[in-house]
Amino acid sequence: VNILIVGKMNKSDELFSAFSMLSKKDREAFLLKIKYVEEERQAEKKEPSILTPEKVQNNRFANDFFCPHCESRHIVRYGKRPDGTQRFRCVDCRRIFQATTNTVLGKNTYRNQEKLRMYVNCMCKELSVRQSAKICGITVPTAFAWRHKILNALRNTCEHQMLSGTVELDRTFFNLSFKGSRHASEFKQLIEKYDKNKESLQQVCVPLAVGREGGFTGKVSTLGWSSTDTILSAIKDHLTSRSKLLADAEISQNNQNGKVLRNVNLTTVKGINEDRSLDAVRKFKQGINESINLKFRGVATKYINDYILWYGFLHLSKQKPKECENLLYDIALYSICSVNTRSIGKQMMPIKLSSGQKMLLSEFLDGLAENTMND
């Protein structure tokens, strides 16, 4: 009598059996995923290097010394602090600074470097301010200030992107929001039917542009409906003579861009054409709307430009997530941050108003002030 003993397959045998049943393309994708996970694991094992004044100075002034106040290159050494940190003096504006001046954390860089690394990781995961504060062990106001300081440094570093070649153009709308303001946040949004010929106080128009060769831009242009010229004016600083714009019929139907851009070709997209599709910018538009309206539950209008730049940096970059995190950490450490904790909330809304909108907004703010006084 022959007895056949069948042993149980262990997990490795089951995995190998399942792997052998995959197609060649799926096996290659699976191996690449394993390689990526292993690289992430090795990167996490590496202990982060401790920042020193010398390291910050060498990294921030790697190319040349500059003044973080006026960006002059005429710099002289001006002694050292008691802890050994080198000081500098600008010959032009005559102000004294050190390697951490006008950065996100300033003089607290060395003390809070570990928390800053954790906070940058939270930003790359697009966590809320309260979630980030809890994870990093900081207060909610501090987490809010760090977010907007990092976004300001990111804007100073990445805002001036040039879009050459084929550029897809679209626009989106967000409700006018005073979120975070002590008084104007009481403004109740009304459900207003969209009318392109009506002066509106309800929504702001945000032109979006994505280059197929890389790069993106998105800025608040005006309240309500925007003409083609207004949309093109918002992005013209990011275009070159080689830029070829693709837009849908609604944007280009009143095309008078010759008055604004003489060297840029604007083409209307009609039907389904792979070369003239708007898939990239529409995907960008959908992601921004979901991020701002759903994930963050609305963003104050004066901060929308920064949030668009943040989203594009994370999702349109060709780098891996860990590389994006390291780059954002370096930007937070070494790039110029032109705002401080007190000035963050005093930013103005980046909106160009028509004469009718100025009158309507003035009446609205006057009424809001009267209601506040009565309360």
Q: At which residue positions do the language-model features occur?
A:
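Residue-level recognition of single "structural anchor" positions
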Residues: 1-375
